């Protein structure tokens, strides 16, 4: 996982952004220590915390369409090994997400805590405990869809209609990491993010 000067993330995006949504599963900048899960959509998706709760806390805007979809609505993990240098030092981990008509949930498991049903290719979200992010109360069928996953692993379509696009990238500086560069401890090691 990148640290200083970077904006690493893994996300899914639909066509005609932000109208068919974006789900940021792993995201942060510079020396952040906690992962941020963010939804971006057209205006009007104002999710609540879903049934069963979440371990993370709400951050940013209530409306996932804030700022024309650019800002989004987020949940920040409460697990110190979920991002950045602690993630790396801990040997990484596994993120799992579940997207249904009624909720979008994301779990994080440190490398040593990955459930056996995930390791054995038989995932059972009902056994994973409370997710770090649990978005509910939005019309997810309207705001999120037609997303494609680009992966080296073969994927199956569910009901023949969902395609996903998953992107993992590490942006050097960029809009977000560059904008908060001066307020991070990274600025002490380099006077600019350029």
Regions found by a protein language model. Name each.
Residues 1-194:
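GH16 jelly-roll
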């Amino acid at each position: 996982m990148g640290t200083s000067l970077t904006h690493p993330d893994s996300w899914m995006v639909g066509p005609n952004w932000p109208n068919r949504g974006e789900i940021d599963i792993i995201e942060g900048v510079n020396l952040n220590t906690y992962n941020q899960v963010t939804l971006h959509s057209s205006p009007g998706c104002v999710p609540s915390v879903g049934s069963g709760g979440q371990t993370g806390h709400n951050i940013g805007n209530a409306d996932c369409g804030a700022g024309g979809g650019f800002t989004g609505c987020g949940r920040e993990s409460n697990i110190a090994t979920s991002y950045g240098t602690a993630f790396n030092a801990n040997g990484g981990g596994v993120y799992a997400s579940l997207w249904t008509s009624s909720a979008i949930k994301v779990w994080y498991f440190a490398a040593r805590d990955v459930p056996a049903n995930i390791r054995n290719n038989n995932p059972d979200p009902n056994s994973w405990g409370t997710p770090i992010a649990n978005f509910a109360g939005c019309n997810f069928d309207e705001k999120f869809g037609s997303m494609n996953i680009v992966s080296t692993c073969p994927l199956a379509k569910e009901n023949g209609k969902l395609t996903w696009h998953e992107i993992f990238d590490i942006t050097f500086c960029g809009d977000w990491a560059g904008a908060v560069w001066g307020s991070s401890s990274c600025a002490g090691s380099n006077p600019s993010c350029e």
